[in-house]
Structures are given as structure tokens and as C-alpha cells.
Amino acid sequence: MAEQYADKQIKLFSLTANREIAEKISQASGIPLGKMSSRQFSDGEIMINIEETVRGDDIYIIQSTSFPVNDNLWELLIMIDACKRASANTVNIVVPYFGYSRQDRIAASREPITAKLVANMLVKAGVDRVLTLDLHAVQVQGFFDIPVDNLFTVPLFAEHYNQLGLSGEDVVVVSPKNSGIKRARSLAEYLDSPIAIIDYAQDDSEREEGYIIGEVEGKKAIIIDDILNTGKTFAEAAKILERGGATEIYAVASHGLFAGGAADILESAPIREIIVTDSVLSKERIPSNIKYLTASHLIADAIIRIHERKPLSPLFSYRSDKKD
């Protein structure tokens, strides 16, 4: 655990979505978690009570807006309001997983842009700054009229794979869809490895028609995506890579949601190991081949840098020498 942080005017509070990562962030930063309570009435209404003064303090509220996304979002909004009404100096939110970020555009007629709606609600509630981790769409930052710091997890993953010796020309980094090329290229640059892409002849409903752009035969493949939801994308990509001659298949994602029967799907896929961060505390069954890498040190460093008005740019080539 880090030494206690000297400045007493910064306070961390954890809401209920992911208490585990909040405790790790507290330990890594040396800032104790503040005292507060959150409960639901029988009709589902949320009630929050901050059990210590926050007057004049810089507040950081830690809350992933994962499942149940609406409960977690409303709990966050209510906590923001409570801090503002208690005369906090600034209210900053730490959202390791930002729910609704996939609804960032109008993909079909008469659809909403819900990511923008959520941004509006947070700003209206009184947020001064947002700190998040691997937004699904980086343009969501532009939906806010306040600073949004979007940390990247690729350096953490690269460190893990370099330690395993998974680097160089005998490894290929694979994007399981053409929209993820930039992410795959970023990891490939850290590993000095080539990239490949899995594309599809038609739309996503014809997954069995997938084909590989790039060379995977005789190589160890690492599939990378930002969100692991049902596991179907990873499982289908792994089968295509196996048919393409990949010798070993690994997978990595920033956020592990594990919705529905993801565990069964992933355990039956030819994937040796799946890496995710601890941004989401899933209540679903977790596949046996999952390994968690903590993002808590990265987030803790960012919080301290923001509070001390230091640049965050060193964190974008982040290397952690700390263990889970």
C-alpha cells in the first residue's frame, strides 16, 4: 500500500458497482475511501448519505456504469448532486467502464444518441471532470463540455504479453472486426508483431463467412477488442484463426461484461487465455481461462496527477512494476 497521501482536501468515494477496484485505487494512491452509504427503498429509489464533511474538498467518485447500468448511473448522478449540495470544491467522476458509450451515433433512422444524453446528464448534475478507461468510441469525449481523460490499457496488456515472451514476428495481433484495426495496431507496435483482421463477406449475421486479412498460419494469435460482452465475437474469431493455422490463440479486452452465457461460449472456444482489466465486477459466471489485470495503479496515478495539476501524457506509455 502506498504511503498516505499528504493533501487532506482530496477525497475518494466508492459507490456500489465495483467496490473492489475502488479499494485497490485507494491503496495505490494512499487516499482512504470516504464514508458514505447508499441504499435502495422497496420501490427502487436510491438514497445516498455522505457521512463526513466534503466542504471545500476535491471529490473523486468511483463508479463503473456496468450492469445494472441504469441503477449504477442513477446512483452516480445522485452522489454527484449530494456532493454539490454539500459544497464540495470540485466533483470528479472516475468511471472505469462507461456504459452507453456504444450508443455514440445514429446507426438507423430515429435512433437516439444516448452517449450524448448521458454526458448531458452528468454535466448538468455538476461534474467538473471525467476520468475513464478505454472508451468504446473516443469521440464520446467530445460530447462533454468539460475535461474528459480517457486512459488506455494497451500498454498494460503489452507488458503482460512481453513477460510471457509473446512478441516478435511469430506472434500476430488480430482485430476480430474491421472497426478495431487501430487498437490492434497499437498493441502490435508494442510487441513488434504484425497484425491481421477478420472481416466478413456480408453483415454480422453471417459470422461463419468470416475470412482473415493477413498471415496467421504457424503464428501465435492475440485477439484484441475493447468490450467482451457475450463472448461470441472472440469465440467465432478464434475458430476462424484455428482454421487458418494459428498455433496458439489468446484474447484480450479492456472490459469484461460476460453477459448471458459468455462463460460457456468462451470455455468451448479454442482460446488458451483471456485477459481483461478489473474495470467491471461481473456478477455472471466467469470463464475458467480468464485472467484479470488490475487497472487500479494506472487510475490512481491519473487521479494524483490531475489533483497536482501534472500532465497525464506519461501514462499513455504506462508501465507498472506493481502486482495485483
Swiss-Prot record:
Enzyme class: transferase
Localisation per UniProt entry: Cytoplasm
EC number: 2.7.6.1
Binding site for D-ribose 5-phosphate: D225, N229, T230, G231, K232, T233
GO CC terms of this entry: cytoplasm; ribose phosphate diphosphokinase complex
Residue numbers binding Mg(2+): H136
Reaction equations catalysed: D-ribose 5-phosphate + ATP = 5-phospho-alpha-D-ribose 1-diphosphate + AMP + H(+)
Alphabetical list of Pfam families matching this protein: Pribosyl_synth, Pribosyltran_N
GO BP terms, alphabetized: 5-phosphoribose 1-diphosphate biosynthetic process; purine nucleotide biosynthetic process; ribonucleoside monophosphate biosynthetic process
Pathway per the UniProt entry: Metabolic intermediate biosynthesis; 5-phospho-alpha-D-ribose 1-diphosphate biosynthesis; 5-phospho-alpha-D-ribose 1-diphosphate from D-ribose 5-phosphate (route I): step 1/1
Keyword list, A-Z: ATP-binding, Cytoplasm, Kinase, Magnesium, Metal-binding, Nucleotide biosynthesis, Nucleotide-binding, Transferase
Entries under InterPro entries matching the protein: PRib_PP_synth_CS, Pribosyltran_N, PRibTrfase_dom, PRTase-like, Rib-P_diPkinase, Rib-P_diPkinase_bac
The keyword Nucleotide-binding is annotated on this UniProt entry: yes
Listed GO MF terms: ATP binding; kinase activity; magnesium ion binding; ribose phosphate diphosphokinase activity
Superkingdom of this protein's organism: Bacteria
Comment on bound cofactor: Binds 1 Mg(2+) ion per subunit.
Cofactor(s) needed by this chain: Mg(2+)
Residues annotated for ATP binding in this entry: D43, G44, E45, R102, Q103
Assembly mode: Homohexamer.
Family per record: Belongs to the ribose-phosphate pyrophosphokinase family. Class I subfamily.
Role according to the record: Involved in the biosynthesis of the central metabolite phospho-alpha-D-ribosyl-1-pyrophosphate (PRPP) via the transfer of pyrophosphoryl group from ATP to 1-hydroxyl of ribose-5-phosphate (Rib-5-P).
Protein name listed in UniProt: Putative ribose-phosphate pyrophosphokinase 2
Organism the protein comes from: Streptococcus agalactiae serotype V (strain ATCC BAA-611 / 2603 V/R)
GN (gene name): prs2
